[in-house]
């Protein structure tokens, strides 16, 4: 049972009776996170005026747990209620510029989705409290600012006077952060679709990605944004350490998302998929299993990872089927000026001239340091910035070898890196 949070000294202020919390602002259109007030969302450019911040958030990196001798009534109640978890994201920046590849998905002349992909995007999970808490406008939990132990809610004993030498608990909203390769699929007209449609399409695409690229279940996960009760976008991210290296293909390959949608329709127990796609008519799809699967089953769309959405998933939804047909027929159109990291093309040519294979499409990260060039089959990675000792140590424990590249490719590829690819 988790007993306390390990609070580093820098988060304590003054005499230790307060914590250095932050207010974060979340875009109500796409779910992007901003630390501080901004005029427009950095991801979708929507106005941020009037957005109510989530106050007093505190990043929690480490906790302490103790063995539980028995399950208490409070434990059972917390499990029964569940926690109100919200997922948000922010795109990485370099020299003040967003490091994002942008594209549109078009079916004919109609744009359906706006896509954004980034390596090492910051994915954050905010724990707002119990789902069935008494006051839904109050977020977070009480914590002892000195010891880090979780404390009782103030409203449980409102009339008890606290002695002056006792530190009062403070309320915080815990937030955990990680960096993952992420793809945002933003519906251009989300109000035109039922929540069941967006939920079904989300899990159909995730299953299609897993099958198309031969991934294990759970390697690619997705979240509806900005919230489960306000589905306007889908955030897909590579959940495994180092990433699977496939989400970037959905942006760079014009027909990759179409292949995924086609595979998803086949997984959903439909025949005559090619005929329906050619005609652009979902009514031509024929149910293969004669009623064995009604709205969804564990052979098609249902899984352990999407249990909260099981009531929404409906493979028989005409709207969901038509959207998947449109996705199978359309193609990706990269936005003007959208490209890979500055300098990557030059290094790709340098690697080729040195006789070593091209790096994977997605980067890897160690200790929050992005390694822009990665060769996963060789467990080798490189970057143009200075390597931290923490990154080297973590990479070494995982069996990776890291290299620092010169600032420009004109200086050539280091001999030590070239030797890693010699038989």
Predicted regions and their residues:
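Nucleic-acid endo/exonuclease domains
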Residues: 206-210, 214, 259-260, 264-284, ...
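Short, charged/polar, Gly/Pro-enriched secondary-structure boundary elements
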Residues: 11-13, 242-246, 421-422
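Residues in well-ordered beta-strands of folded domains
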Residues: 28, 186, 235-238, 374, ...
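Inter-lobe coupling/hinge segments of SF2-like helicase ATPases
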Residues: 11-38, 49
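Short, flexible, solvent-exposed loop/turn segments with mixed acidic/basic and small polar residues
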Residues: 16, 173-176, 371-373
